[in-house]
């Protein structure tokens, strides 16, 4: 199993351990294995969305109903969703987990991703804390711990998953 597949499996197991009611997201190369495993899971549905702000809406609806939801997006996708994130998730203190692939970091220096990283750093982190982890070495209890934090803080927990050197 390759490094990306192994980290995708590890992330899936952490998501499953948190027992979410649903997982929602849009396609992303770093999350491809996790998305595949979520879509095949019998424990929760994977709701594929066309736009990132739809994932925030789905998660907000679940949280309003008292259910756990996980969002899978890229940093640029969360930036696209910032209006929905601020006016729904933050305004109404809705706890859910957002797993963000943080593109453009030092170990991911594609020229087209660097601005995504800079914009993410400059905007999302002014709204809510962002907890960063190396995608290749995620703790097993990452998503359960993120839910505990989100539920205590009464706001989404944003986890930035980053490639490492």
Task: Put a short name on every predicted segment.
Residues 1-165:
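Thiamine diphosphate
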């Amino acid at each position: 199993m390759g490094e990306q597949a192994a980290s995708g499996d590890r992330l899936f197991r952490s998501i499953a351990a948190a027992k979410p009611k649903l997982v929602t997201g849009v396609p992303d190369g770093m999350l491809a294995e996790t998305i595949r495993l979520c879509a095949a899971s019998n424990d929760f549905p994977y709701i594929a969305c066309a736009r990132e702000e739809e994932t925030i809406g789905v998660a907000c609806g679940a949280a309003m109903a008292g259910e756990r939801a996980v969002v899978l997006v890229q940093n640029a996708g969360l930036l696209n969703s910032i209006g929905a994130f601020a006016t729904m998730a933050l305004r109404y203190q809705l706890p859910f987990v957002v797993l963000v692939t943080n593109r453009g970091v030092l170990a991911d220096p594609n020229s087209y991703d660097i601005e995504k990283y800079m914009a993410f750093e400059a905007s999302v982190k002014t709204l809510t804390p962002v907890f960063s982890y190396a995608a290749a070495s995620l703790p097993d209890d990452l998503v359960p711990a993120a839910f505990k934090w989100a539920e205590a803080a009464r706001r989404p927990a944003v986890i930035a998953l980053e490639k490492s050197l």
